[in-house]
Amino acid sequence: MFIAMNRFKVVKGEEKAFEQIWSSRRTRLEEMEGFVSFHLLRGPEREDHTLYASHTMWETKASFLAWTTSQQFRDSHKDAGKNKPLYVGHPEFEGFDSVLEQINTTRDAAAEAAL
C-alpha cells in the first residue's frame, strides 16, 4: 500500500471555497489501476490558515507514479494554478509506503450477526 498526501495551508475564511473546488473537481482517479481511495481531510486551524490534506491510497507506489504521469492527472490538475490565492505557501507532498496494516475484521462480523 502507498499513501500519497498533499498538505495545504488554506487562508482563513477560504475553507468553503477550497472544499468546493475539491468536491466539484473531476479527478478521474477511479480510471487508474491501483487506485484504492481518496479523502480530503481538514486539520487544525491556525492564526492565518486551516490545514488540509489530500490523502490518496494506492495498491503500489508504481500505481501512484503512473497516475502522476497520466492524462487523467493532467486533466484534473489543469486549473490548479488559479487557486493560489487560497493558499499560504505551496502545497507540500508526502509519500508513504505502508509497513504495517491492521484491518478491523470484527466490524463486518458484528454487522452480519446483527442481521
What are these regions (language model features)?
Residues 2, 20-21:
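Coiled-coil-like amphipathic alpha-helices with heptad-repeat character
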Residues 10-18:
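Short, surface-exposed ligand-recognition loops at beta-strand->loop->(often short) alpha-helix junctions
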Residues 2-9, 39-70:
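Short, well-ordered beta-strand segments in beta-rich or mixed alpha/beta enzyme
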Residues 4, 17, 53, 62, ...:
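A sequence-composition feature that detects small, non-aromatic residues
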Residues 20, 26-36, 57-94:
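An amphipathic, aromatic/His-enriched active-site/gating alpha helix that lines ligand/cofactor pockets
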Residues 11-12, 23, 28, 39-41, ...:
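Short secondary-structure boundary micro-motifs
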Residues 2, 39-48, 78-115:
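Glycine-rich beta-strand-turn "strand-cap" elements at beta-sheet edges
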